[in-house]
Amino acid sequence: MNHFVICINNDSNPASLILGKVYRRLPDPEAEAHNMLRVIDEDKSEPNGYLYPASMFAPIELPKVAVQALIGSR
């Protein structure tokens, strides 16, 4: 599973999403079945993330060092 996405459209929520920024994607099979993604956005008040249309993001692969910097080593 790809754990990171990049915002490619923030028209519907510019306060919570920054165009071109990398966001952590959380697993949510039910949301994905409806073409939605659960994402930790700029608000960060909801630790379980918010749902956004998948069309607002593009999946990306990051090097291990970048993943560790974003979520910590596990």
What does each model-identified segment do?
Residues S45-R74:
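Intrinsically disordered, low-complexity, charged/polar segments
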